[in-house]
Every structure is written in structure tokens, then in C-alpha cells.
A protein has these predicted regions:
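N-terminal helix-turn-helix DNA-binding core of bacterial DNA-binding proteins
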Residues: 2-42
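Residues that scaffold the ATP/ADP-binding catalytic core of kinase and kinase-like folds
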Residues: 17, 80-81
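Ser/Thr-centric signal marking residues that sit
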Residues: 42-45, 74
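Short, hydrophobic-biased segments on the C-terminal half of alpha helices
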Residues: 47-49
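Beta-hairpin "wing" of winged helix-turn-helix
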Residues: 53-67, 72
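Amphipathic alpha-helical dimerization/coiled-coil segments
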Residues: 82-101
């Protein structure tokens, strides 16, 4: 799979995982696991990239004596999900054309 396409898919999967409620790293990995194997290091790279792109913001909370970062989707992140859905539909139309006999 093309690296840019894969990166886009991973980014949107992470955004989707935090769309309805703020979440933290381990829970995000657990939430996307049914559709995607995601390592911790890959997730944190994605989260950093999304934060730099203003698609999410980070809130630090002390939980059971430990620091936990919660990630919250921004309007830019919500917009990216919608853009991706539109782009994916176009890709699916192209795919149908290619595999058609």
C-alpha cells in the first residue's frame, strides 16, 4: 500500500477512535484493534503528527498517581474525517472500475 495512503488511513482511524469521547493511548490501541494492528510507537507518532496539524489537542490528567494524556478531536480533525470519507468513496469508484470484468 502506498505510504501516503496508509498514513492517511491510520490518521483517520485514530481520529475516529477519539471522535465521540476523549481517550488515551492504550484505549485508542484497544479501540482500533478490531480493524487495525497498531503498535504503541506507531500510535504516538500518529498522535504527535495529528497534534501538530491541529487535528487534536492534548489534556494531561493525573490518574491513580500517574500522568495520563487524553486526546480530544478538534474541528480540523472532524473535518479531516469527512474529507477522508469523500476521498475514499472516489477510490472505491476507481477500484470498481479496475476490477470490473
Amino acid at each position: 500500500m502506498d505510504i501516503q495512503l496508509k498514513r492517511g488511513v491510520l490518521d483517520v482511524c485514530v481520529l475516529k477512535a477519539i471522535k465521540n469521547e476523549d481517550s488515551y493511548g492504550y484505549k485508542i490501541i484497544k479501540d482500533v484493534k478490531p480493524v487495525l494492528e497498531l503498535s504503541e510507537s506507531t500510535l504516538y507518532t500518529i498522535l504527535k503528527r495529528l497534534e501538530e496539524a491541529n487535528m487534536l489537542v492534548v489534556r494531561v490528567v493525573i490518574h491513580e498517581g500517574r500522568i495520563r494524556k487524553y486526546y480530544h478531536i478538534t474541528e480540523n480533525g472532524l473535518k479531516r474525517i469527512e474529507e477522508f470519507k469523500s476521498e475514499w468513496k472516489e477510490l472505491m469508484d476507481i477500484y470498481q472500475f479496475i476490477v470490473e470484468e
